[in-house]
């Protein structure tokens, strides 16, 4: 499979991630423009700028069987996986052409959380070694080691860990391979590291200087509005999240 085919598959597979809500939504009527096209999304940098990002998965191969996910191991979809240098090269090419100002990188979980996280970190490492100074948002993989979370945080501008669903009961129902602790633990670790390095600039020992965020799937389970709002407020208070 060539690089363009991988980009087509993995850009499309990433477009419904709510952390970049400018893509994945359809428009009706006769106006021009399309927000449903995969590949480019918009986010807010630490200094308040709105930046255009290449939004893509490292791979849509996944060992998990989450009922809400298009890339579930049970689903019959076209699969692809980048090599780290391929995705780094694409990002640099798009950046030099002024198509994007940064990268939003997520992934399915292939082989193990640590293996997947290592491959994603390698993409970031290549970019920074090639003096890429653009914005990077990386989705941390629940279950990955703290050592890998540390490596990612020193390379990225923002990190996020998806809380996925409002309760452990909901996780058991729709994402039985995941647990609340595997999600909350990395959130807490990232919060601690951000606090320890607060005020330092990226490249001078800063850790995820634009903070961390998360997302929750609403409406797929019987959790009440009160539960969801209480959870969101608790996440903001305990983990100093930039956005839920």
Please provide the spans of the model-predicted regions.
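Flexible loop residues that form catalytic
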Residues: 74, 108, 164
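Short Fe-S-cluster ligation motifs
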Residues: 90-108
């Amino acid at each position: 499979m060539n690089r363009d085919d991988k980009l087509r598959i993995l850009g499309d597979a990433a477009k419904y991630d709510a952390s970049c809500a400018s893509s994945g939504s359809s428009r009706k009527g006769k106006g021009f423009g399309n927000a449903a096209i995969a590949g480019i999304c918009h986010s807010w940098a630490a200094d308040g700028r709105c930046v255009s990002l290449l939004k893509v998965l490292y791979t849509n191969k996944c060992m998990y069987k989450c009922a809400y996910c298009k890339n579930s191991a049970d689903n019959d979809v076209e699969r692809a996986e980048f090599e780290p240098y391929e995705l780094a090269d694409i990002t640099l090419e798009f950046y030099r052409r002024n198509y994007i100002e940064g990268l939003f990188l997520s992934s399915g979980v292939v082989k193990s959380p640590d293996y997947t996280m290592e491959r994603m970190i390698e993409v970031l490492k290549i970019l920074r070694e090639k003096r890429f100074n653009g914005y990077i948002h990386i989705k941390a993989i629940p279950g990955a080691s703290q050592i890998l979370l540390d490596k990612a945080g020193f390379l990225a501008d923002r990190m996020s860990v998806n809380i996925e669903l409002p309760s452990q009961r909901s996780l058991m129902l729709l994402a039985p391979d995941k647990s609340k602790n595997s999600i909350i633990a990395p959130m807490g670790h990232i919060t601690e590291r951000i606090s320890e390095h607060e005020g330092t600039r990226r490249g001078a020992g800063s850790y995820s200087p634009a903070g961390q965020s998360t997302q929750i799937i609403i409406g797929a389970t019987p959790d009440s509005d009160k539960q969801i709002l209480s959870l969101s407020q608790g996440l903001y208070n305990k983990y100093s999240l930039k956005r839920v």
